[in-house]
Amino acid sequence: MASHDHHHHHHDHEHDHEKSDGGEGKASWVGKDGKVYHSHDGLAPHSHEPIYSPGYFSRRAPPLHDRNFSERAFTVGIGGPVGTGKTALMLALCRFLRDKYSLAAVTNDIFTKEDGEFLVKNGALPEERIRAVETGGCPHAAIREDISINLGPLEELSNLFKADLLLCESGGDNLAANFSRELADYIIYIIDVSAGDKIPRKGGPGITQADLLVINKTDLAAAVGADLSVMERDSLRMRDGGPFVFAQVKHGLGVEEIVNHVMHSWEHATGKKRQ
């Protein structure tokens, strides 16, 4: 499944550069494969894949079997809508793991380098281990259709620091965005309760197919009238029983459980043992 995505990635771009049907200079055009392509701010063109269902955890794309971790370390992708706590989770994971493992991080922002600067300012990792990428207007493309903007910095950091683990934070996007398996070996999708308890049942690839769903800011539940038991029920149903964690990342609650999920997968993928 994941390798299928990858072939499409190259296939799409063969057509993109031709900009068929007189599409030169247009913001969007129809490729020879019938898909509508568009590009933003000079980023490589990409299409928006149609989504016909909320997705299924059991049918999610499996991690790649032929991954060479000496080329790029085990990569954790952290996605989710704007303001849910992605950068706070990046910081928490760095603090939890940095003393035992060699880490590096790449952040994606649409037009700024704010998230990367936040990690530097808060001492998540030494500054040289953090890269901030500006994705332009379509942040989902940088984690799915046009991942080269992230692969480059990740591979460079991995080799430079002999990394054990890489963290990649997506730009804030909608519920339909999710990481390509070509980029992320383990996918965390983070939502929060401030939008109400209906979010898990809305579904979308992030909620249903991420390896781990994190429901953050549970301390706000009472204030916004969100029922955590409803969120738990809907998360179990939407994710076919796939794992999720209630958390207050800013206060450290749930972080160790998240780390345990990540490191279990890291052990399984790399054959190494936790320190």
UniProtKB/Swiss-Prot annotation:
Source organism: Arabidopsis thaliana
Positions that bind GTP: 80-87
Disruption phenotype: No visible phenotype under normal growth conditions, but mutant plants cannot grow on medium with urea as the sole source of nitrogen.
Keyword Nucleotide-binding found: yes
GO terms under cellular component: urease activator complex
Family: Belongs to the SIMIBI class G3E GTPase family. UreG subfamily.
Swiss-Prot/TrEMBL keywords: Chaperone, GTP-binding, Nickel insertion, Nucleotide-binding
Subunit note: URED, UREF and UREG may form a complex that acts as a GTP-hydrolysis-dependent molecular chaperone, activating the urease apoprotein.
Entries under InterPro entries matching the protein: CobW/HypB/UreG_nucleotide-bd, P-loop_NTPase, UreG
Function of the protein: Required for the maturation and activation of urease via the functional incorporation of the urease nickel metallocenter.
Database matches in Gene3D superfamilies: P-loop containing nucleotide triphosphate hydrolases
Single Gene Ontology BP annotation: protein maturation
GO MF, one annotated term: GTPase activity
Residue span of region Disordered: 1-31
Lineage: Eukaryota, Viridiplantae, Streptophyta, Embryophyta, Tracheophyta
CDD domains: UreG
Protein name: Urease accessory protein G
Biased composition (Basic and acidic residues): 13-24
